[in-house]
UniProtKB/Swiss-Prot annotation:
Domain RNase III, residue spans: 24-146
Pfam families, A to Z: dsrm, Ribonucleas_3_3
Protein's GO biological process: mRNA processing; regulation of gene expression; rRNA processing; tRNA processing
Annotated gene: rnc
Location(s) in or outside the cell: Cytoplasm
Protein name (record): Ribonuclease 3
Length: 245
């Protein structure tokens, strides 16, 4: 089997939509990795709204690879950090928000291949879709070049994020940060409510609101689970609270 002609499922891609050569070149430069098999990258960027094959299997693989690589990176970088803090810190770096941030920096939203309906509804900007594509790309690199190479790519991608870390905030998720900040100012804890749930049962997207009445702050978040949506809303509320108060 000639891999360059096949997807990770071993089936020739029949999708009419293709990546443009110029887009492929620019993306490779940003990513710091050039795919030897462009069809594999195309699969990683193909949303399930286009049918099969799509990037869901590569996303599954990339999720495991990313967790292993980030765990190793944090273990080596923060030698004195205890297991509990390392676990929470890793969660912050492999969650939807972090992956969406990486995907946006790479311009994945402009490259993602979507069905017409999904694109018209703004799918190319949806955090969950971009985060999933980021994981799929990581899975594709691993499949093509092995762990050592994908680990190098992941370290390069995460270095800027690690350099921005405030040591006092290690291992704390947005909801915890917001709660501690409000408690330090003797303000009532935020109120979370689900505004909307859309999508099929196996692929739901939650829209959650975070309200801090005393600060007149009202933010929203979106995620593939209620918890992820709450974390996103809390992250935005925390940023506003720190700036205003």
């Amino acid at each position: 089997m000639t891999r360059s002609k096949f997807t990770s499922q071993g089936i020739k891609s029949k999708h009419a939509k293709k990546l443009k050569k110029q887009d492929y070149t620019v993306f490779s430069q940003k990513l710091g990795y050039t795919f030897k098999q462009p069809d594999l990258l195309q699969e990683a960027l193909t949303h399930r709204s286009l049918g099969f094959p799509n990037n869901e299997r590569l996303e599954f693989l990339g999720d495991s690879v990313l967790n292993c690589a980030v765990s190793t990176l944090l273990f080596k970088r923060f030698l004195l950090l205890p297991e509990g803090d390392l676990t929470r810190l890793r969660a912050n770096f492999v969650n939807q928000d972090a992956l969406h941030q990486l995907a946006s920096a790479l311009g994945i939203g402009e490259l993602i291949l979507l069905g017409d309906g999904e694109r018209k509804s703004g799918g190319h900007q949806r955090p969950s879709i971009l985060a999933n594509a980021m994981e799929a790309i990581i899975g594709a690199i691993y499949l093509e070049s092995g762990f050592e190479k994908v680990d190098q790519v992941i370290v390069a991608l995460y270095d800027p994020l690690l350099n921005q870390l405030d040591p006092d905030l290690f291992g704390k998720d947005p909801k915890t940060l917001l709660q501690e900040y409000l408690q330090s100012r003797k303000v009532d804890l935020p109120e979370y409510s689900t505004l909307l749930t859309r999508g099929d049962a196996h692929a739901q997207v939650f829209h959650v609101e975070c309200v801090i009445p005393e600060f007149a702050i009202r933010t929203s978040g979106e995620g593939t689970s209620r918890r992820r949506a709450e974390q996103e809303a809390a992250r935005r509320a925390y940023k506003l609270a720190v700036v205003r108060h």
